[in-house]
Amino acid sequence: MSDDNSIASMAARLREAQASGRTIAPLRDTCPGGDATLAYAIQQINNDLRKTNGERVVGRKIGLTSPAVQKQLGVDQPDFGALFASMAYGDGEPMPLASLIQPKVEAEIALVLERDLTAEKHTFADLISATAYAVAAIEVVDSRIRDWDIRFFDTVADNASSALFVLGSRPVLLRDIDLTACAMTLAQDGEVLSRGNGAACLGNPLNAAAWLADRMVRLGTPLRAGDVVLTGALGPMVAVKAAGTYAAHIDGLGSVRATFTE
């Protein structure tokens, strides 16, 4: 099941799930032979519709970079999705739970670019030169797939299970920090629920960023100055069960908060 009508139908199912707040069965059940190319085609349909409706892409997220998260979801490789301006919230700004379906939070290191990344193969030096600063971030992930019963095909099609994100307010130059050594804690109202470090993100968040930069060049849509790159989770995701504040602290980058309201 890989013709244009089938792809459009699966994309429409995801849009309807988001609009209604009702999850759907895994897309892989509809398309058992679906591969990454097909999944990204589904993602692109919905992202293009958002842009047609006036939404603005402000960067990319990398998913499935932490072995802990890969283990949770039964996958073994990264993926990526688009970040839109409408997904961005300020540090501690209230996020209505009603706009989400089955949200989870994860702590990440975000990069904000000041130069385009257009090389065929990017080095750490390329990334350091092109990055204005790094900052602590919380990504709110969500799935339109029932009970988070996802595999690689499902999450890629679903814009890498993206929802919202929050950037911290303490920018740090990459040359001033060792990202692999950054310890992370993620707590809800003071109770630590997740721990990790920069090395949990493909060994170094810059490995994830280089993977994304290379991939986007191959696709003809390179990362540009001003883009935000969420490099991936530093530890296990935490399910958001009710209203409250989740605070991530990353050594050297400070803290950032995601606050959920009923």
From Swiss-Prot:
Any one Gene Ontology BP term: 3-phenylpropionate catabolic process
Disulfide bonding pattern of the chain: none
GO annotations of cellular component type: cytoplasm
Gene Ontology terms, MF aspect: 2-oxopent-4-enoate hydratase activity; manganese ion binding
A Pfam family: FAA_hydrolase
Cofactor(s) recorded in Swiss-Prot or TrEMBL: a divalent metal cation
Source domain of life: Bacteria
Enzyme class per UniProt: lyase
Record EC number: 4.2.1.80
UniProt catalytic activity: (S)-4-hydroxy-2-oxopentanoate = (2Z)-2-hydroxypenta-2,4-dienoate + H2O
Residue runs in coiled coils: none
Pathway, per record: Aromatic compound metabolism; 3-phenylpropanoate degradation
Keywords in alphabetical order: Aromatic hydrocarbons catabolism, Lyase
Family: Belongs to the hydratase/decarboxylase family. MhpD subfamily.
Role summary: Catalyzes the conversion of 2-hydroxypentadienoic acid (enolic form of 2-oxopent-4-enoate) to 4-hydroxy-2-ketopentanoic acid.
Protein's name according to its UniProt entry: 2-keto-4-pentenoate hydratase
Organism: Burkholderia vietnamiensis (strain G4 / LMG 22486) (Burkholderia cepacia (strain R1808))
Name of encoding gene: mhpD
